[in-house]
Amino acid sequence: MRYGFYTLDVFTDQLFGGNPLAVFPDAEGLTDGQMQKIAAEINYSETVFVLPPVTETGNFRLRIFTPKRELDFAGHPTIGTTYLLGLLQPPSPLVTTTWQLEEPVGLVPVTLHYKQGQLVQTELTVAQLPQTKDSAPSCEDLALLLGLSIDQLQQGEYEPQAYSCGLPFLFIPLINEEALNRISFNPSVWQNLLAGQWADCVYCLAPGDPSLGLSDNKLIHGRMFAPGLGIAEDPATGSGVAALGGYLDDRLDTPGSHHWQIEQGKALGRPSQLQLTVVKDGQGIRAVKVAGRSVLVSEGFMNLGN
């Protein structure tokens, strides 16, 4: 059997920027084991397999695999796959359209934004609003994990804390971008400190303007490390940025629609831009949205024998 696939760069408008993604747009007939082996063979952060929907309201069903395991939800695969499907199976007419994507976390609404008939970007709305639980390890231990001094970690209002919109992340705010660039991640410390914990993906953050609190910044820099998923460092992490919406929301007092740009991937030479929107009212958070652009890179076939 031959299965067609495409590769894209996600959360960028530049070839060879952003986060690479492989998508199999017609994955019917593949077993769970084959999907996992294919994801390990391609060895991107994630590989997506598209299947027919199983609900009345779903447009497509996505299965998302890292080199090590399947995920309930992931941002850059959702954003990039929707972009690809918008090219392969465009809506008619070519106007802004929202599809419902079936993922293990639930139905994920994704909006395809068109401008003058051209697909510009895609934007997901999380199926699961941010949740938080578990206390974070001490700042002393986290400084050791990152190869930093403890005074390079923020404390107080912006202390480390874990959130999830389907995939948990431990957020560690640092004092500035210089500290972020100096990270020397220690996998051995991670193994002893976080392996097997609810949030074992580590997302480090730095304010664009260190004179302002993280939630008051419009620009936030980030780096994400996920040894448990087989990802040493990720160039762009949509599910992490979605969960970040919960971290920032808990530190915001003003209702309304709040927007941030998250820049990630610089340390890997793959700069990425992710747009985060949090909508809240007097009762709390109402919606979290993550948007970005994608670039189609290549297409090919994988031969799996008879």
UniProtKB/Swiss-Prot annotation:
<protein>
    <recommendedName>
        <fullName>Uncharacterized isomerase slr1019</fullName>
        <ecNumber>5.1.-.-</ecNumber>
    </recommendedName>
</protein>
<comment type="similarity">
    <text>Belongs to the PhzF family.</text>
</comment>
<feature type="active site">
    <location>
        <position position="46"/>
    </location>
</feature>
<keyword id="KW-0413">Isomerase</keyword>
<dbReference type="GO" id="GO:0016853">
    <property type="term" value="F:isomerase activity"/>
</dbReference>
<dbReference type="InterPro" id="IPR003719">
    <property type="entry name" value="Phenazine_PhzF-like"/>
</dbReference>
<dbReference type="GO" id="GO:0009058">
    <property type="term" value="P:biosynthetic process"/>
</dbReference>
<dbReference type="GO" id="GO:0005737">
    <property type="term" value="C:cytoplasm"/>
</dbReference>
<dbReference type="Pfam" id="PF02567">
    <property type="entry name" value="PhzC-PhzF"/>
</dbReference>
